[in-house]
Amino acid sequence: MSPAEIPVEAWLLFAAPVAAILFGFFILRPTKPEWTHIPILISCAIVTACAFALAARVYTGHSFDVNVWRWAAVGKWAVDFGLRVDGPGTAVLSMVALVGSLIHVYAAGYMKGDPGFSRFFLVFHLFFLAMIGLLTANNYVQLYLFWELVGVASYLLVGFWFHKESARKAALKAFMVNRIGDFGFLIALLYILSNFKVAHFNLIYLQVAYAQQNAALPEMLPVIGLLLIWAACAKSAQFPLYFWLPDAMEGPTPTSALMHAATMVTAGVFLLVRSWPLIAVTPWLPPLVAGIGAFTAVFAAVIAATKKDLKRILAYSTVSHLGIMMLALGLGQIGLAIFHLVVHGFFKAVLFLCAGNVGHAIHQPTANVDDVGGWRKALPWTYACFLIAALSLSGIWPFAGFFSKDAILDVAWEHGGWIKWASLLIAFGSAFYISRMLFLTFHGDRPEQKGLKAHPHEAEPILVVPVFFIALGAAFAGLLAPGISRLVLYGWSGLPLGLPGLAGVLNLPGTPEIAQLTFKDALGRGCGMAALGFAAAYYLTMVDAGWDWRWRRNSPRLEAAFESDFGWKTFVMWLADRVAAGARFCGRVLDKKWWDGLIEGSADGARGLSETLAGYASGRLNDYLWWIAAAAALLMGRALR
């Protein structure tokens, strides 16, 4: 396919957001800032329609990968700007477009009246555009550029309310931790260019497949895979680099919803999907990915069960579910990882937006479980949507989460080993923390019964209707399993799937089996453990209602352990202090004394030399003749030797 043959909907994916941002920035912001959201919402509608049109093309076997123009060439290396529209990309793109657009609508109501309304929408849509670019990149250099743009936009959004010190610190922490991962991605990119001489995905896949067939894999391939996993752990908040994400809740609720459901944190998982042919050929890397994912999923679920702030509970929930996606990848289930990424986008967006509505009811950016309770009647629509999303997250049949999450846990059970038992803990923990949040927020004692003043009310329609439509996806997205299987199987753009070794690397033969659980499975391990989680949460929040504060009072050390993430956050802060102290030492000793001393000493030496030489310039002709004679004598003596 030539650039002239690219479908118009592919061009509009970029043209509409860019036009909306430029029009909003140059025309509306100086004149009518309160109208900035109008062209952006129109852009969202166009992007959503185009995303589904492209997904339909791929579903019917018309995927494409085309270089649009060459924008950099250095020696033998050349990098093109291209479009890759294939199965994994369009599956995620469709969810990002739909969920992201509805979050934009929600944001129009949520941010109304904020002094930074115009600035928020421009950066928010840039965030949206960056993720579209990341999903449609056809080479590593292009993906890296959009990867960085996603990070910059998230920094601006997390620190949007920069008048708050906590927001500034959270934005800086998120940015700095992601820089650690981004550095790994950059080094991996340099190794890729050095070893493969190209950045294009397909050309790299083919080289890996041929090298594997001939037992001539590059020696640096394990290092490249490890660096890419490191980058994904930072962006997708996996242990040990997960700790930035809970603090990133300082931004407005729409930021949290878009970041957790449809953009930034899913980028790391998608990077591994794109890079799996490079990773899977090293035997010890997939088990490493699975181990990181399983451990993070259990670890974050335990922490989530102890938090009080609604958005922090959901933040640790996101960390846990990203771990489930990493677990699926490590077990070779690319289709399941993509499918759960899509389903997670629906139910996590609903949960965050419902948390925003709860905070809106008490006129706060977020809410604490101690300040709410018994609000199912005061907020009926929010409660209904939250309940649907909670059941989906827990993996209860027939909600969407069952078809994705429980399918992954079923594969993990069959895998055996410690991951088998981790899958049970994940199923139990997910149901426990989300049902605890449900019961403490919408059931139990109302705030006035606790001696607090609160007059909750349902949010305006613009804050409820988008949540309702996303909740439909959380309920019924499980029906997409066959379609996503087909996209993943037939949508690897331009790949000759019959090439020996390549199909095995991608694990394509197993992908159509995603989410095909039997009813017996539904009532078995996954739903059984989820039911136990619900029952335990109900007993500890509704029957023994004082348990949640009683264990904190009786076990302050245990509470401190949970608060510090079992000491990991304390260790990270200690390490950060040591690094900062080292930087200050370098600035004080190396920079001020040694480096400045070297520079000043060089200047003093040059000045002294010039003064010495200046002394010989007496201005008398006899002195100059003497120096000329001496120089001539030296030259003659050297010539006669």
Regions found by a protein language model. Give the residues of each.
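Hydrophobic transmembrane alpha-helices and their helix-loop junctions in integral membrane proteins
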Residues: 88, 102-143, 152-462, 466, ...
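Transmembrane helix-loop-helix hairpins at membrane boundaries of multipass inner-membrane proteins
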Residues: 1-9, 26-122, 196-216, 243, ...
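Aromatic-capped, Gly/Pro-kinked transmembrane alpha-helices
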Residues: 76, 484-524, 542-641
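Membrane-interface segments at the starts/ends of alpha-helical transmembrane spans
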Residues: 2-3, 213-215, 411-416, 507-524
